[in-house]
Design a protein with these regions (language model features):
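A general structural motif
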Residues: 48-52, 98-102, 126-130, 151-156, ...
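Glycine-centered loop/turn positions within well-structured domains
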Residues: 63, 131, 164-167
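N-terminal [4Fe-4S]-dependent radical SAM core
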Residues: 2-54
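Radical SAM enzyme [4Fe-4S]-AdoMet core and its adjacent flexible, acidic
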Residues: 1-14, 56, 77-78, 83-86, ...
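Residues lining the SAM
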Residues: 71, 106, 205
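Conserved Radical SAM active-site core
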Residues: 75-134, 138-151
Length: 277
């Protein structure tokens, strides 16, 4: 009955789409997916180019994250590198040009381990596609950026951040000194990005583990310290932060009390941001 009412009353649909808690989900994913015709084509068993295409160019990964579903022994030989780039380029060539956000670069293996990552970024740009990349930033050193300046041409760069101190990050990634290395790389990146006047949208993704809902406030403090250490005229170098729960098969879900606490912490962060603190 409820679904029938919603289908037949546009005002209810407007409330859900424009004012509901899932507004971004509807407007950024569901509605564009429907408008693309992909769902109708699937039902009718007609071919259509995928609505979103993930490019996973990593050859290996230095992390063994506790919530990652990948095979920790997985890696690709360097001999397959050129063939892989050729396949990616063919895929980009075949893609319809009506959606500039069709592609993104990510992976169960770390994208920066591909020494030709710059070629992929440039090829997307050449074909008028936006390029966004997700990385753990362990390799995002000054030297790496010098060798791969194409990183600054990305439309969006999102770093997966795995802990608010060295102990927690090591527990998650199984990589010693990962917290120190990644934090240092982020600080250097924002400085270089500012100097090069790069327009890349930059931010972090953080996984909220069970019983770690207070980490959000500590995470914000870390970002504030990075901003202070960078000492740029631009006070805030971060354009966004995304949060998610541990959705791995054996991940421990947050209970209602922990969700309420996390919600309160998010509101606290909003207040700090509004006060420019």
């Amino acid at each position: 009955i409820i679904n029938s009412i919603i289908r037949n009353i546009p005002e209810f649909q407007e409330i859900i789409i424009e004012r509901g808690i899932g507004t971004k989900y509807w407007k950024n994913m569901i509605i564009p997916l429907i408008n693309s015709g992909s769902i109708d084509n699937f039902i009718s068993k007609n071919y259509s180019f995928p609505f979103r295409v993930g490019i996973y160019p990593g050859l290996s990964c230095m992390f063994e994250c506790s919530f990652c579903g990948r095979n920790y022994n997985a890696k690709y030989e360097r001999g397959s590198l050129d063939r892989g780039i050729e396949i990616y380029q063919n895929l980009i060539d075949e893609a319809p040009s009506d959606d500039p956000n069709r592609f993104y670069i990510s992976g169960g293996l770390e994208p920066l381990t591909n020494p030709k990552i710059g070629e992929i970024i440039n090829y997307l740009k050449k074909n008028n596609f936006n390029s966004s990349m997700y990385t753990n930033a362990h390799m995002l050193t000054s030297r790496y950026l010098e060798k791969n300046p194409e990183i600054f041409n990305l439309n969006s760069l999102r770093i997966s951040f795995y802990g608010i101190d060295d102990e927690q990050t090591t527990n998650v990634t199984k990589k010693k000194n990962a917290f120190k290395i990644v934090t240092s790389n982020i600080e250097n990146y924002v400085i270089q990005k500012y100097k090069k006047k790069s327009e890349t949208s930059f931010g972090l993704n953080y996984v909220i583990l069970k019983n770690r809902e207070d980490d959000l406030i500590k995470l914000i403090n870390i970002l504030c310290n990075i901003n202070k250490n960078a000492n740029l005229s631009k006070k805030n170098s971060f354009d966004f932060i995304t949060l998610r729960e541990d959705f791995s098969i054996y991940g421990k879900r947050m209970n209602n009390h922990q969700r309420e606490k996390l919600s309160a912490n998010i509101k606290t962060v909003d207040k700090l941001v509004s006060k420019n603190e």
